[in-house]
């Protein structure tokens, strides 16, 4: 018998870090994201966490964004990630931000990235992941 998949209306029960693709030993950069609870969770999974611009490539970047000017950092940040890495843009849900999903998608495309996943980051914030297209990944 096939297992029943949860409906889109039901929240995921997977742990947040699993949803975000943070694996043990992942290299992570955090920019403009003041969330002590999230950082505590990250430290339980990986010790390789940088605040700000990393000196070497990272697997994941978590960018807190509330404004268009913060989204413009995507073009520079794409140089920070491994070819198969990702940048999560975390922003307030609902009308608490000037940014809409379409704004994030457009900023990603302008930076040469595509969105490929969304996640509920918290009760108040959502996140959208951006990655290189397969054909555009640096060798």
Where are these regions (language model features)?
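Short, charged/polar "capping" segments at the starts of alpha-helices
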Residues: 35-41, 96-99
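Short, glycine-rich nucleotide/cofactor-binding loops
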Residues: 61-71
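Conserved class I S-adenosyl-L-methionine
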Residues: 20, 25-34
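Class I S-adenosyl-L-methionine
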Residues: 113-139
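Mid-chain, well-packed structural core segment of small domains
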Residues: 70-103
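Conserved Class I S-adenosyl-L-methionine
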Residues: 100-119
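Class I SAM-dependent methyltransferase Rossmann-like catalytic core
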Residues: 1-19
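Short acidic low-complexity segments
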Residues: 48-58
């Amino acid at each position: 018998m096939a297992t029943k998949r949860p409906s889109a209306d039901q929240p995921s029960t997977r742990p947040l870090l699993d949803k975000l693709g943070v694996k043990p030993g992942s290299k992570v950069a955090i920019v403009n994201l003041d969330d002590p609870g999230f950082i505590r969770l990250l430290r339980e999974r990986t010790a390789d966490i940088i605040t700000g611009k990393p000196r070497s490539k990272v697997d994941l970047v978590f960018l807190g964004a509330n404004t268009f000017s913060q989204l413009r950092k995507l073009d520079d940040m794409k140089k920070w990630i491994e070819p198969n890495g990702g940048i999560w843009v975390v922003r307030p849900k609902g009308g608490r931000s000037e940014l809409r999903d379409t704004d994030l998608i457009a900023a990603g495309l302008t930076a040469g990235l595509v969105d490929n996943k969304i996640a509920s980051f918290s009760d108040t914030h959502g996140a959208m992941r951006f990655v290189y297209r397969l054909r555009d990944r640096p060798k």
